[in-house]
A protein has these predicted regions:
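Conserved ABC transporter NBD signature motif
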Residues: 64-75, 80
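Conserved ABC ATPase "signature" region
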Residues: 104, 108, 115-133
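Conserved ABC ATPase signature
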Residues: 137-141
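Conserved catalytic motifs of ABC-family nucleotide-binding domains
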Residues: 158
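Catalytic Walker B motif of ABC-type/P-loop ATPase nucleotide-binding domains
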Residues: 162-165
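Helical segment within the ABC ATPase nucleotide-binding domain
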Residues: 177-189
Length: 252
């Protein structure tokens, strides 16, 4: 169990990133505790995808630091990235490989011994109700089932924190709710922390905390209930809109 001396699953301090004259992230700081479910809520263009690209090491930040379970991403990228399980907005499965082979390929990238990889794959297939489809190509799966496979793959190496980057985009309402339910269940069963990026208020109501991102700035970091109370609004949607309209002032 985490204690006061255990470093958080994720620590972001002063993260800044610009593309030419446009500043996509401006001095962003946030923390995700061990086993915590934190929703990153922001409209399109808020900087959510840029943040996830920096977290996953696809690009470097102009300033600031990222520490994953005590490992500085810049100083020790291998150890830091190994603590992440990531489901990107765009599907990243190899559609020609079988369901099982997608899991085993991921295990190989993380240096898992063959016997352990096969045991973990069998466990994930069972847990995500994919055992009967293990030998089918990923191409044969529906959108919702592909997302389940991507989540199973992200958990293969037992990460400290899951990064879910708009993972429900393109899913029907039933599949979207099912994916959210599974992620919450994995958090409860495995103690994995979650950073869930979304623009949909209905996906954040049960989060431990909500971080509202707008124009590259953190506008609010609090519980869903406090977000409503602090803005003086009646619903999460109204609170979100009040913080992310063009009239909303970003922090100086």
């Amino acid at each position: 169990m985490p204690n006061d001396l255990t470093p958080p699953a994720l620590l972001v301090e002063g993260l800044t990133k610009s593309y030419g004259p446009r500043r996509a992230l401006d001095n962003v700081s946030l923390t995700v505790g061990r086993g915590e479910f934190v929703a990153l809520l922001g409209p399109n263009g808020a900087g959510k995808s840029t943040l996830f690209q920096l977290l996953s090491g696809l690009f470097g930040a102009d300033a600031g630091r990222i520490v994953v379970a005590g490992h500085d991403l810049k100083a020790n990228p291998t150890a830091a990235l190994a603590r992440f399980g990531i489901v990107f907005q765009q599907a990243t499965l190899d559609l020609e490989l079988t369901v099982q082979a997608n899991l085993l390929f991921h295990a190989g990238l993380h240096g898992m011994p063959s016997a352990l990889a096969r045991a973990r794959a069998a466990e994930m297939l069972e847990q995500f109700n994919l055992s009967a489809r293990a030998k089918e190509p990923a191409r044969a799966l529906s959108g919702g089932t592909r997302r389940r496979l991507e989540l199973a793959r992200a958990l293969m190496h037992e990460p400290t924190i899951l990064l879910m980057d708009e993972a429900t985009v393109g899913l029907d309402p039933a599949s979207r709710l099912e994916l959210l339910r599974i992620v919450r269940e994995m958090r409860e069963k495995r103690g994995v922390a979650v950073l869930w990026a979304t623009h949909l208020c209905e996906e954040v109501a049960e989060a431990d905390r909500v971080i509202v991102l707008h124009q590259g700035h953190v506008m609010k970091d609090c519980t869903p209930d406090d977000l409503i109370t602090d803005t003086g609004k009646a619903t999460l949607m109204e609170a979100f809109v009040s913080l992310t309209t063009e009239r909303a002032s970003v922090p100086a």
